[in-house]
Amino acid sequence: METARVLVAADKFKGSLTAVQVAERVTAGLRRVVPGVRVETLPVADGGDGTVAAAVAAGFERREARVTGPLGDPVTAAYALRGSTAVVEMAEASGLQHLPDGVFAPLTATTYGSGELLLAALGAGATTIVFGVGGSATTDGGAGMLAALGARFLDADGKPVGPGGGPLAELAEADLSGLDPRLADIDLVLASDVDNPLTGPKGAPEVYGRQKGASEEDIAVLDAALAHYASILGPDQAALPGAGAAGGIGYGALVALGARFRPGIEVMLDVLGFAPALARATLVITGEGSLDEQTLHGKAPAGVAAAARAAGIEVVAVCGRLALPPEALEKAGIRRAYALAELEPDPAVSMAQAGPLLERAAESIAWDFLLR
């Protein structure tokens, strides 16, 4: 099919391939079968880790800043800038990747560095900031972030409370008067695939605390501490969608920074220029490491497929592992999915050989959809 124009808009395969590498491998596989096929690549992300990399691949400039990591030590964090729009990924400053293997600090990990990263974007002239939240090592309700931006959180003796979510149980006063005045003049968009509230059975500690090393006792402590924190800052916002994102940093951004919440993939498709790229395509290839129930709830492939289906463009997906029945794929707008596990059932081998296997999957797509 000489007129075929393929848009590759896939997320990363976590632990094996970045979104950029996925696009490269899919392109190579397609061209092995149809050398002249026109392929446009647009690596995507949903606001979690990989969001800055996707923006850079779309033409944003990569910037770096030295900030405070989740354990209090300095780390280098990247953000992306194009004109007056910045893409800031909280995981770059406060993510799990900054913790040594097996080391967690569920009660004391801080988002202070995320606030410093926002300051760097402000200093670079950003007036619109897309704040991607996900992959955090923290459950501090965004208190660390707000402290870096000029807020003060004091105990009953007028002393600053310690870092992390646990010490918020001692909070007596929250003073937001020192927040950087530039924050009042920007559009801060909270981009997340998580719409959980701050606390309760579906809140940040209960749903995500365990993956950050929290014990059952820690979860109870954090939930109570964040509820107390919210009672002082503003209890109404604690129930808003996205308040529980990234250990509650969503709440801090909503209650104190005037942020507006949008599903991460919707924001990123806008920022990355997906609509004009889609208009040029006759076939879309999306995907991520695992296509499962979570995919259907705000993950990148679901967002890409929904937009493509609305435009009447056929969508196929690539993945490492497929855990959705055909009817669920069809409902999501995905015509067919190609899983690396079908080519190599051993998960360890499949991850290690993800690149070559993905090229083989793309060859199959070319035979099935470009030469039919």
Show where each model-derived region lies.
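N-terminal loops that bind phosphate or other acidic moieties
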Residues: 1-133, 137-372
